[in-house]
Structures are given as structure tokens and as C-alpha cells.
Amino acid sequence: MSESSTGAGLGPGIVVIDKPSGMTSHDVVARCRRIFCTRRVGHAGTLDPMATGVLVLGVDRATKILGLLAGASKEYVATIRLGQTTSTEDAEGELLQCVSARHVTDEAIATAIGRLRGDIKQVPSAVSAIKVDGRRAYRLVREGHVVELQARPVRIDRFEVLAVRPGPEVGLADVIDLDVEVECSSGTYIRALARDLGDAFGVGGHLTSLRRTRVGRFELDQAWSLEDLAELPRLSRTLDETCLLMFPRRDLTVSEVEATSNGRPISSAGIDGIYAASDADGRVIALLRDEGPRTKSVVVLHPVFVRVSIGRGIVGVIEA
């Protein structure tokens, strides 16, 4: 099938991609814009080129909720190498230092990882997309600047060691590879966990592999490859299905639908946090939150449409 003509007519929704290694998240978005025949495609959280796994994309109006998806918790499987420091804190960077990790015991690893669980302050990786004086940190690093980022609060709900192995390559007998599984809040840098774990032993550390297995309610077993989508373009979930999966539901009356679709507040529902306000057909009109006795629109997904005359008796319908 041609990528230039197969994606029309699917409507707004979410697509879960299994990102291959070597592609940037923007590369994946660009490919899916061709597959779905629309410029309105975005992603809900960057994966580094080296990393693979779950990348959640929004198509058409579903791009409006990507910011909410980006804040969801995430899960990863990764391999951390103790005994080597690189310029990027992962396998793509320049090797800066090698220090024997032979003395690091399993018990010491368990203790150090325990200190990285829970609510912690993490200094993000300098090679990140965080902006410093209006410029991305990774660009400054590549230009030779020293970038110092402030520690940020993150939460590590789970950080487990799956396996401990000696380095497999010739000449790397003094390094240790840890296969780990991490469940964490949005904004956590797994590279920074590798760095901090290596620093705890004074031997340095970096990531040699990273695979994201979950973003919020979207898991790896729901993901498609780009080749699958090029052959048969499809959505993982429609926009309405996604909203009803992620948020509590509030059913609206006819008058509430009219008000909500115009962005006007209605009476509060007594629901904590963001909720999906839907009509009788299950169409999610908007995402709302309560503010006192009234609601506040987080995002209007089905705005009101009005009929307008465009001349010679022709009537058109436009989004107000």
C-alpha cells in the first residue's frame, strides 16, 4: 500500500507504536503523518534514538490530549553497565572513564537501588531536551558547553534487578551489567538512574539498552510496528475510547452538552480530578474538572458546529 493514500477516514485517535532503535521520536511522527495523510500527528513523550518500545501518538484532534498522556507513569526495562562513564550516559556517547566494578557486591547493589526508590530529587541528564535559557540542553552539550541542571522531584515506584552479569566483551571483565525494571513518574530519566547508581560506587555507570514497556494505560502488547501501520493504517483507540479509558465518565444532559461544547461552565459533578463529559451516544464532548460549584474546561474535544451561508443558497458547516 502507498503511504500517501491509505490513511484517510480513520478519524481522531491514539496509535501505540513500538519504536525501533535508531529513529528519533520526530522521525516516527513524520512517518505516521505520511501513513495517516495528515500533519496533525504528535507524540506523548520522547524516546531517545537508542531506545525502543512504547511511543504513544495522537492523530487529528487527539493531539489535544497528548499533554495529559505525557504526564502518565511509565515502565521500562533497561541494562545498566557499572564501571564505565560516557558523555551521554548511554551507549551512544563517548567513553570517558573505565573503573573496575569487580568489588561491587549484589548486596551493595540492592542497598544502593533501595536509596533510589520512592520520592527522590533527580538531576536530569545533561543530554536532555530540557531548555536552558531557551535552548535545548543536549544542543549546548554538543557545542561543548558545560550544562548544570537543577534537581527535580520524581517518583520511582519500582526499581528491581532482574539479572546481574559480568561484562560480556573482551577487555570488559571488570564491568557489571544489570538488567533492571523501572516503574516511575513522568519526567524521570533512566539514564540518570544509571549515572547515579554508578556514582554511588565511585565506578560510573551508563545505559546500554532501554525499552519502554508502558505509558499510562498503554502497554507494549498493544503496540504496532511502523511496517504494520504502513500495510494497514489503523488506530489503537478512538479519541472517545481513549478518554473513557483514561478518565472517569460524566453523562451530560442535552442542555449540558450544548453548554460544554461552547466552553461554558456547568454545575460541578463532585468528581476528583479530570473527567470525561460525554453525550448520550458516548461521544466525549470535553474533558472537565470541578472548580467549586462550577466546571472548568480542560479541553473541548467536540466544539459546537454552526451552519453558515456561503452564497447562492449553499449552506456550509464550520467549527465555531
UniProtKB/Swiss-Prot annotation:
Classification via SUPFAM superfamilies: Pseudouridine synthase (SSF55120), PUA domain-like (SSF88697)
Record's catalysed reaction(s): uridine(55) in tRNA = pseudouridine(55) in tRNA
Organism: Mycobacterium leprae (strain TN)
Positions of transmembrane segments: none
Record's function text: Responsible for synthesis of pseudouridine from uracil-55 in the psi GC loop of transfer RNAs.
EC number(s) recorded for this UniProt protein: 5.4.99.25
Protein name: tRNA pseudouridine synthase B
HAMAP family on file: TruB_bact
Source species taxonomy: Bacteria, Bacillati, Actinomycetota, Actinomycetes, Mycobacteriales
